[in-house]
């Protein structure tokens, strides 16, 4: 689908392992089912409570429009086009601020880590470089989440 940079199902393996730092935010440590990616994600648990063992679908996209049309980064309440956000429970908009690899001087990176800030809520998605090829520093991305019943 146009505009989707990454999509997978994640299992919540740990919550706030270093201790709770903020009242309304928890840091989730998750692992994906298909691509074995590691995810660390800050979530506003007052809006979207998450429990240990929960499974959720995560999509990282460059646009909310199904046809891949880029938006201008501003909310337009009169826009009535269908949106990817309609199918999800929790959506954030942020900026990729760092990409790190395990490259050496002789080999290209096989594992990458993409870091995104969603207004101060942070995400690190780490895994095979092939799964993170669409991420670019300073690009704007949407994170979309929906819990799965299992």
Swiss-Prot record:
Non-specific ssDNA binding: region residues: 16-40
The scientific name of the source species is Homo sapiens
A Pfam entry, by short name = RNA_pol_Rpb8
Q: Which Gene3D superfamilies match?
A: Nucleic acid-binding proteins (2.40.50.140)
What is the primary gene name for this protein? POLR2H
Q: What is the lineage of its organism?
A: Eukaryota, Metazoa, Chordata, Craniata, Vertebrata
N-acetylalanine found at = 2
**Protein name from the UniProt record:** DNA-directed RNA polymerases I, II, and III subunit RPABC3
An example of a Gene Ontology cellular component annotation for this protein is: nucleoplasm
**Source superkingdom:** Eukaryota
Q: How does it assemble?
A: Component of the RNA polymerase I (Pol I), RNA polymerase II (Pol II) and RNA polymerase III (Pol III) complexes consisting of at least 13, 12 and 17 subunits, respectively. Pol I complex consists of a ten-subunit catalytic core composed of POLR1A/RPA1, POLR1B/RPA2, POLR1C/RPAC1, POLR1D/RPAC2, POLR1H/RPA12, POLR2E/RPABC1, POLR2F/RPABC2, POLR2H/RPABC3, POLR2K/RPABC4 and POLR2L/RPABC5; a mobile stalk subunit POLR1F/RPA43 protruding from the core and additional subunits homologous to general transcription factors POLR1E/RPA49 and POLR1G/RPA34.
GO terms (molecular function) for this protein are:
DNA-directed RNA polymerase activity; single-stranded DNA binding
């Amino acid at each position: 689908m146009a505009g989707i940079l990454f999509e997978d199902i994640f299992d919540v393996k740990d919550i706030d392992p270093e201790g709770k730092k903020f009242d309304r935010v928890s840091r989730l440590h998750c692992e994906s089912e298909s691509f074995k990616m590691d995810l660390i994600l800050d979530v506003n648990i007052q809006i979207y409570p998450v429990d240990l063992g929960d499974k959720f679908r995560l999509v990282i996209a460059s646009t909310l429009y199904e046809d891949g049309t880029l938006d201008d980064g501003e909310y337009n309440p009169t826009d009535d086009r269908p949106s990817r956000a309609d199918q999800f429970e929790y959506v954030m908009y942020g900026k990729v601020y760092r990409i790190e690899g395990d490259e050496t001087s002789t080999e290209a990176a096989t594992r990458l880590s993409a870091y995104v800030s969603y207004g101060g809520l942070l995400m690190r998605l780490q895994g095979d470089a092939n799964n993170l090829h669409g991420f670019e520093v300073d690009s704007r991305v949407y994170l979309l989440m929906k819990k799965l019943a299992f």
